[in-house]
């Protein structure tokens, strides 16, 4: 926007029936330049999105593969989780190990090993339609979680 870059590095997959609204770039640029309040809200949204990406990149780069998995599980819990107790979270969003590996920028085999290790230590458990984190604080402690606001520490 406001420049001539035609490359977009994101894809979207609808999880339920959705309607798509499309605006030409020029139309949005015109709306933003004519409406300062809309521009401010847009900039706030952009800043939050930037903070989400920065924190995810930080976790992937600084915490290694295990930290990437732990931070991804924390983000999944914050986005789709139902907190059952102070330390247990039910994630009602089915993901394959391949999908989790893609979120962590690592291989499925590596994720399988780490998830099985967490399962062996009763940190998490799996079911076909959901995953349960039994020791949420353990994951946070392992990556020295900074307790980012929930609108930042999310998958979406």
Task: State what each model feature region is.
Residues 28-29, 139:
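A generic structural signal for short hydrophobic patches within well-formed alpha-helices
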Residues 1-17:
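Cyclic nucleotide-binding regulatory domains
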Residues 17-19, 130:
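Structural motif
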Residues 78-156:
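Phosphate-/nucleic-acid-contacting segments
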Residues 32-36, 143-146:
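A short, polar/proline- and glycine-enriched secondary-structure boundary/capping micro-motif
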Residues 15, 33-103:
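Polybasic "coupling" helices that flank or enter modular domains
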């Amino acid at each position: 926007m406001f420049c001539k870059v035609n490359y977009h590095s994101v894809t979207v997959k609808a999880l339920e029936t959705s309607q798509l609204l499309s605006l030409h770039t020029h139309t949005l640029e015109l709306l933003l330049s004519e409406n300062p309040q809309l521009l401010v809200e847009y900039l706030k949204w952009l800043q939050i999105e930037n903070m989400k990406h920065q924190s995810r990149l930080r976790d992937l780069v600084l915490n290694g593969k295990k930290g990437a998995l732990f931070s991804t599980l924390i983000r999944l819990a914050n986005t789709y989780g139902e907190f059952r107790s102070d330390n247990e979270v039910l994630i009602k969003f089915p993901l394959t190990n391949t999908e989790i590996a893609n979120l962590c920028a690592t291989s499925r085999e590596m994720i399988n090993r780490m998830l099985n290790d967490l399962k062996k230590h009763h940190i998490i458990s799996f079911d076909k339609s959901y995953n349960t984190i039994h020791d949420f604080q353990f994951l946070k402690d392992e990556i020295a979680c900074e307790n980012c606001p929930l609108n930042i520490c999310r998958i979406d």
